[in-house]
């Protein structure tokens, strides 16, 4: 059986190594790659540079699906807002690349899956906005502390893709201080936390365009491997159609 190729953008950050000064590194946390491979896909990693951005459309043509992984806050100026003081320093090159990959994949009929920041990127790419600092309004700001994942329950909406794959309620590891505010074009909220935060989105049609606000890569078996397997299956079908592969 063909393993579909899944594009993911790398993050750029300062890293330290024993005896060496800090240096900019393009990287992606290994659990994201492990999650894609556990679900049956192969990760294809793209650097968040202007050169890569110029080839974003060609990258999507070469792969079968796109995963937008977690990371720092999306630049608020991308959706027309002034940044909140609590926001991370932006990595605009990654924002631009992931938005381009997302829109090209949607235009090409290829599946898109967003995780945490990735769900927010999908929403922004389709014209939505974000709530920039949840601690300004939610009753439990400790749910989104820096430096740790916090478990909490999310409830899915019956009849949706996340409901079919994950059930009506699940306990998930979460780490974020931003969330979806207004939904992008053609998207609907399909899961919520107890504080009302949108925890999953998907397209209103039958296409596989899904985002989850939590981190399934941290506990795949109980928090999302099945939705990633569905994404990989949809990507494999795309590969079969585009490349003429025979399903076995």
Residue ranges and their predicted role:
Residues 209-214:
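Active-site-proximal beta-strand elements of phosphoester/diester hydrolases
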Residues 114, 118, 123, 127:
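Gly/Ala-rich beta-loop-alpha elbow adjacent to hydrolase catalytic centers
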Residues 1-111, 124, 131, 135-163, ...:
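N-terminal beta1-alpha1 cap of cysteine-dependent amidohydrolase-like domains
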